[in-house]
Amino acid sequence: MYYAIFESPIGPILLAGDEEGLKYVNFMKGKKKIEVPDSWVENEEFFREASRQLEAYFAGELKSFDVKLAPEGTEFQKSVWNALKEIPYGETRTYGEIAKNIGNPKASRAVGLANNRNPIAIIVPCHRVIGANGKLTGYASGLDIKEFLLKLEGSC
């Protein structure tokens, strides 16, 4: 597994993946030291395209990503993550709407859990999911980052 650190306007982001694709995009919020398994190898070149696209996203120049993804999760989680990728830039959806979109309308809580476990932040836009009341709700990296991303996209 390779990794690199992308310096974003809201702090460092850990990128990790292998030949199958990108497996992790995680905010390093509040972490003084980056800890990765000993078997991981730092390789900025491997993530050049993902970093370029993230840079363009934060500059407001990119609305959808085109990088190979290989998230690890259950089939249900992957179905939720695929549904998240269908939420257009600048728009939001509720957990209930995502549940309906994946054909399981009573699974909004399970959708919330899968959303929280999304290993590929930003690119799989879990930040675009809001509560049924239209309010910002839980975000693994903190509501301040969620609000920043939604404001960047013009949906908050």
Curated annotation (Swiss-Prot):
Localisation per UniProt entry: Cytoplasm
Superkingdom of the source species: Archaea
Active-site residue list: C126
EC number: 2.1.1.63
GO molecular function, one term: methylated-DNA-[protein]-cysteine S-methyltransferase activity
A GO CC term assigned to this protein in UniProt: cytoplasm
Biological process (GO), any one: DNA alkylation repair
Main location: cytoplasm
Reaction equation(s) it catalyzes: a 6-O-methyl-2'-deoxyguanosine in DNA + L-cysteinyl-[protein] = S-methyl-L-cysteinyl-[protein] + a 2'-deoxyguanosine in DNA; a 4-O-methyl-thymidine in DNA + L-cysteinyl-[protein] = a thymidine in DNA + S-methyl-L-cysteinyl-[protein]
One Pfam family recorded for the sequence: DNA_binding_1
InterPro entries cross-referenced by the UniProt entry: MethylDNA_cys_MeTrfase_AS, MethylDNA_cys_MeTrfase_DNA-bd, MethylDNA_cys_MeTrfase_DNAb, MethylG_MeTrfase_N, MGMT, MGMT_N_sf, WH-like_DNA-bd_sf
Gene3D superfamilies for the chain: Methylated DNA-protein cysteine methyltransferase domain, Winged helix-like DNA-binding domain superfamily/Winged helix DNA-binding domain
Residue stretches in coiled coil: none
Top enzyme category: transferase
Family membership noted in the UniProt record: Belongs to the MGMT family.
Role, per record: Involved in the cellular defense against the biological effects of O6-methylguanine (O6-MeG) and O4-methylthymine (O4-MeT) in DNA. Repairs the methylated nucleobase in DNA by stoichiometrically transferring the methyl group to a cysteine residue in the enzyme. This is a suicide reaction: the enzyme is irreversibly inactivated.
Alphabetized NCBIfam families for the sequence: ogt
Miscellaneous comment: This enzyme catalyzes only one turnover and therefore is not strictly catalytic. According to one definition, an enzyme is a biocatalyst that acts repeatedly and over many reaction cycles.
Official protein name in the record: Methylated-DNA--protein-cysteine methyltransferase
UniProt organism field: Methanosarcina acetivorans (strain ATCC 35395 / DSM 2834 / JCM 12185 / C2A)
